[in-house]
């Protein structure tokens, strides 16, 4: 098994299998920074479901994060307290009740069952699914004992390091 495949297996064990993960999601603000410089990063915690290199979250299409992703889909994530950081692309998959989202919606409702109905109004067409498609990431095992630098696009290990 390659380092990349080993890393994927560990990601599935840690974050997959129907787990509700809390991740820090960073996007790029639409407005310039307070000092007049370029756009600045904005970070918030979201609940996310992991499957095959993608984290999924249910959110509101008119939220700041979704507006930011619409203008610049580059995102960065960290799984809280799990030593996994990654960069990727955010994508609005549309309304949760769109028939194309039925299978994924059922998974999300199951994973987030404890709080899903309290936090989401599915009748509102702005209740949407955010897909965070990972492009590169680093999984840190036992405080730097072993690092998995993964390139999800090319499905390989990055030999010269990764995302810290």
Question: Model regions: which residues?
Answer:
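Short beta-strand segments
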Residues: 20-61, 67-69, 75-79, 86-89
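Extreme N-terminal tail/first-helix region
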Residues: 1-22, 157-159, 164
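Short Pro/Gly-enriched beta-strand edge/turn motifs at strand-loop
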Residues: 18-25, 110-115
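Charged, gly/pro-rich active-site loop segments
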Residues: 85, 89-164
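Residue-level signal for tight coil/turn positions that link beta-strands
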Residues: 52, 81, 134-136
